[in-house]
Swiss-Prot record:
Location in the cell: Cellular thylakoid membrane
UniProt similarity note: Belongs to the phycobilisome linker protein family.
Main location: membrane
GO cellular component, one term: plasma membrane-derived thylakoid membrane
Protein name: Phycobilisome 7.8 kDa linker polypeptide, allophycocyanin-associated, core
Role of this protein: Rod linker protein, associated with allophycocyanin. Linker polypeptides determine the state of aggregation and the location of the disk-shaped phycobiliprotein units within the phycobilisome and modulate their spectroscopic properties in order to mediate a directed and optimal energy transfer.
Keyword Thylakoid recorded: yes
Keyword annotations of the record: Antenna complex, Membrane, Photosynthesis, Phycobilisome, Thylakoid
Location of the CpcD-like domain: 1-56
Biological process according to GO: photosynthesis
Taxonomic lineage of the native organism: Bacteria, Bacillati, Cyanobacteriota, Cyanophyceae, Synechococcales
Length: 67
């Protein structure tokens, strides 16, 4: 199954002391190829930024279907 390994940065939900002080959360997750658009919309809606996207498969050396 084709998967994307995405690294994204989203602002945290909790406000710390002042409104200006924001804390960002970085995370990496595997997203199925078919759900990529939905996940991208979710991150953007939260005010986040996608840092890196890689095509990943479950096992090393597996053909990812790219020519």
């Amino acid at each position: 199954m084709r998967m994307f390994r995405i690294t994204a940065c989203v602002p945290s939900q909790t406000r710390i002391r002042t409104q200006r002080e924001l804390q960002n959360t970085y995370f990496t997750k595997l997203v199925p190829y078919d759900n990529w658009f939905r996940e991208q919309q979710r991150i953007m809606k939260m005010g986040g930024k996608i840092v890196k996207v890689e095509l990943a498969t479950g096992r090393p050396g597996t053909n990812a279907g790219l020519a």
